[in-house]
Amino acid sequence: RDLIDHVAIHRFFRTGGRDVDFSEEDYYSCVAESLLLDDDIAKADGLFKNYDGSGDRIGLVIDEWATWHSNAIRDAGLFQRNTMRDAVIAAGCLNTFTNWSDRVVLTSTAQAINVLLHVIAVDGRFAWLTPNFYVFEMIRNHVGNDALPADVECPDLAGGDGSSGGLPQLSVSASADPERRSGVVCVANRHISEPIDCRVTFAGLPARSAAASLLSTSAPNAFNEASGPDRVTPASTSVDVDDGELRAELPPHSVALFDVELN
């Protein structure tokens, strides 16, 4: 144990077909595969508990994680267009890391520019932000807060093989700053075609007000490119606060970030 501070693992999601021209089955297959990341972390956590010191825990590093679509081949530089589907998957992964922040100490998407689940794309003199960039920008509002356990109640969706169960419609992470009496909630609606009414309550700390940012598109295969760099961008959206509870409707294949003032 004295020789180990961290252990690193990789996880790629490769069952989603092509980057843009994917089917509904491809969509759900890739989204469902991303849940394996939570299984990876849970298994590592169970193993590491046998070796953790009294005040010193082995840190888990996910040093490469990404969607990897079938047309992202080495001869093409592993480039793939990143769509709203990728953003929903990225949000789910980042929520997972937040929920496991007592064990996960560092993560790194593969990669930052042009490769697989990148946040910036460059083509000659043109550069633009992918939908993934905005998910990272939203989730950073958790930084400096205390992670909170999220008790989520939502329907399960059909898997890529048409089976039901095992894929929660919502992915959620939450955090709070007790001194500032503020909270942050990130929610991804994984359903490819249906919205969902979302209600959020901070146990013992009713919400006073909230602001919301929404990353949403009409089609799950929407993406940004040089000729349309702003097709997928976040926008402010309405959120109601009633008796300390947040209420909002989340469109299909969307990611929302709620900044909350608590009583």
Predicted feature locations:
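Acidic, Ser/Thr/Pro-rich beta/coil linker or hinge segments at domain junctions
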Residues: 205-246, 250
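Aromatic- and acid-rich polysaccharide-binding/catalytic face
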Residues: 1-35, 58, 63-67, 104-105
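Beta-strand-rich recognition/accessory modules
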Residues: 245-263
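Gly/Pro-rich turn-and-neighbor structural signature
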Residues: 33-52, 57
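Conserved, mostly hydrophobic/aromatic
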Residues: 7, 44, 64, 107, ...
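Aromatic/acidic polysaccharide-binding cleft in carbohydrate-active enzymes
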Residues: 57-172
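Carbohydrate-binding surface patches
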Residues: 166-206, 212-215, 253-259
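Generic recognition of flexible, low-complexity loop/linker segments
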Residues: 47-51, 93-97, 124, 170-175, ...
